[in-house]
UniProtKB/Swiss-Prot annotation:
The keyword DNA-binding does not apply. GO terms for molecular function: structural constituent of ribosome. This is Small ribosomal subunit protein bS16. Keywords: Ribonucleoprotein, Ribosomal protein. The gene is rpsP.
């Protein structure tokens, strides 16, 4: 099963997460199919969250499940974008 989840990067005490589509049996930071965004929880001035919405929609369309944390981040990103 394909799952969209966070893969941790960064250094000690300075986490950085890639939002990736991966097989659920792979390790957290292991092999992934596609990187669809990033989340930087310690960003001060720069962009802290970016999600390629078109790719996220594609993966959900082919049956990928979102992890609970990624689901929360997607909702947060939707609120942050101005209504068009």
């Amino acid at each position: 099963m394909v799952i969209i989840r966070l893969a941790r990067g960064g250094s000690k005490k300075r986490p950085f997460y890639n939002i990736v589509a991966t097989d659920s049996r792979n390790r957290r930071d292991g092999r992934f199919i596609e990187r669809v965004g990033f989340y930087n929880p310690v960003a001060t001035k720069g962009e802290s969250l970016r999600i390629a919405q078109d790719r996220l929609t594609y993966w959900q369309g082919v049956g990928a499940q979102l992890s609970p944390t990624v689901e929360r981040l997607v909702k947060e990103a939707a609120k942050a974008q101005p209504a068009a």
